[in-house]
Amino acid sequence: MSPLSSLPPKTFISSFHCHSVTRLRRSVTARTMSSQSSQRVFQLRQDPLTGNSEWIVIEDNDQPGTSTDGLLATTSYLDMLNDSRRNIAYRLAIEKTITEPCHVLDIGAGTGLLSMMAVRAMRGDSKGMVTACESYLPMVKLMRKVMHKNGMTKNINLINKRSDELKVGSEDIASRADVLVSEILDSELLGEGLIPSLQHAHDMLLVDNPKTVPYRATTYCQLVESTFLCNLQDLRNNEAKTSDGVRLVPPGLESLFGIKSQQYSMHVDAIEKEIKLLSEPVKIFEFDFWKRPESNGELDVHIEAKTTGSVHAIISWWVLQLDSEGTIFYSTAPRWIDSNSEIGVRDWCDHWKQCVWFTPGTGVSISKGEKVHLHASHTCTNILYNLKKTQSLTHERTHFPLSTGDLHLTLPPERVAIYGDSIYRQSLFEATRKALQGKSYPQCLVIDDSLLLPLMALHISNRSRVLSLSPGLQENAARYFEAIADSNGFSKDRFEYFRDGKTNLAKAYPGKIDLLIGEPYYSGLENGLPWQNLRFWKDRTLLDSVLSEDAVVMPYKGVLRGCAMYLPDLWKSRCCLGSVEGFDHTLVNTTLGGCGDLPSGKDSPCLPFFIWQCGETKILSKEFTVMEFDFSKPITGPCSGEVQIEFIKPGVCHGIALWMDWVMDEENSTVISTGPDDKYWKQGVKLLGKPVTVRMEGPSSSIGIQASLDLSSNSELIVTHTIS
């Protein structure tokens, strides 16, 4: 694991500044306590239905109740180990690099695949040794089992520490290592702490001029035009086209609101038809693993446009050279690049994607043959861009001067696009207007992190008063609404951010709330499963006492919907493992959440994905309703539902896509769907244990879906299926 990492390994979350980031689906914090006999980790886990956090205990030994299955089942380890192209490249490079007994260091060892490859390359010679460090205790426990299964326990010294905690000459590592093997890479390349890890290793853990696998990484970028990508950040211009009269980004206050200036991982192959290439690929940075890297770097390059257009985004990727001779490569480039290269096109995988850097506003207009100036820089964890038409050089990142102190409210790109979508806004506006009808002096309570609904309620009724809980955005939301009040034509005394919690709210406003509303949207749950936004119902239940007799709750109900899908790429990336480059990995399947040949009684979890980014996909059935949740009433107990799938197309069914439809009013006149037809929402995916062949004629398998959800205890949706 990289030295700066305080999080478990292999996450899917975006990069943060100042520390390394790993690849779990949700960010967690872990604290370690150890003794001579065992080790114990306290890991912070958040309940998405309440926002509350609790410490859970992970024991070094496998005592009942301390299973790590749930902690690793949502990680990308399985996807990575199913990436055969990556596995083969590492095997070939390790066999080519390690030709005699030596001391090998594996940083961020995971299941131990690279360590075992190194042992095999030394042919089990007792003069050779492998030191493997892995900081996350659940993964350490799993690696021990894999090592034992493959007879490698005596050949690998596994240490449950970060690499920067190792000291040469101690019981951890007797001497400096001759060879470094590692895979501390994310989609951006640097986000898992590659640079600080290499710096510490070269300073403290490796011999001079060591051998390394990989040998070098090179980043590339390409200028593109894409209306879809532009919509993910340009709220100001999209909002100007709407007719609701509400302005999230009023003129002159653009600095208040936007996305973070960072790289965003994305499968750009899925939108290839929506992308216009404006330049040839450009080489940006080289990082040599075999020597100590610098913490920061800069590059200025002039890029010639090969066609006329507007630069809406910069797409980036990297290429690994795994051996020193330059014969073994691995690339994360888009298919339109690799299809024309010697490296070739890799199979779809989710653990490494391309990255997108957004150009602010409407982009940079360029003409064919014109050159634009790109300033690229990197920190220890990020690669940054600044694109200009002028030839004047600047080493500053693009930003708007803040006009209201340091306030800058940041939202994910998909949320920015949703707020700029005229259809979504019109639906929300009409639903809010309808909910306010007949109420003279309405007291409105917005219980989620919506930015649109408070403004719409204030705009539609000039006698309304709005309370907002903003549980995720908190004080920043309050400051934001205060800053845009004048531009939206309401006095600040009509809006209140209630900061004293739901319990005190119930005491302060008993029976006084006429309208309880939400989109629902909770900051921090964007990468979660769709039904986790049923936190709205949980909060509504807790606040039942504040509602007046004729209070309106919006949305009126939530509907869990689904459809059967052909998902060959996703299923292949999450299927159970057998032999990985000659090493038995069958025992990791349950722990890592595999689908396929799991033991009886075990099942793979529901995972959140943008369906449109999941490689080849096809909808095979009619959409169906699994469960309905009536928000007009408090939660009274567990919910359940079952449905028989009605197929409309032949094919192979790999899984079920699940999402929420929000019915905004009792008459069902306004329904906001988060299904796979829209690219701005993630869906939940439940992969089948075995793919099912569907025929339209003759005998064919039938699939029944059963689901249950107990919101009084947790947000885990239990989905099972029967095949007949």
UniProtKB/Swiss-Prot annotation:
InterPro entries: Arg_MeTrfase (IPR025799), MeTrfase_PRMT7 (IPR014644), PRMT_dom (IPR055135), SAM-dependent_MTases_sf (IPR029063). It holds the Pfam family PRMT_C. GO terms for molecular function: protein-arginine N-methyltransferase activity. GO terms for biological process: methylation. Belongs to the class I-like SAM-binding methyltransferase superfamily. Protein arginine N-methyltransferase family. PRMT7 subfamily. Its EC number is 2.1.1.-. The keyword Transferase applies. Arginine methyltransferase that can both catalyze the formation of omega-N monomethylarginine (MMA) and symmetrical dimethylarginine (sDMA). Signal peptide: none annotated. This is Protein arginine N-methyltransferase 1.6. The active site is at residues 183, 192. Keywords: Methyltransferase, Repeat, S-adenosyl-L-methionine, Transferase.
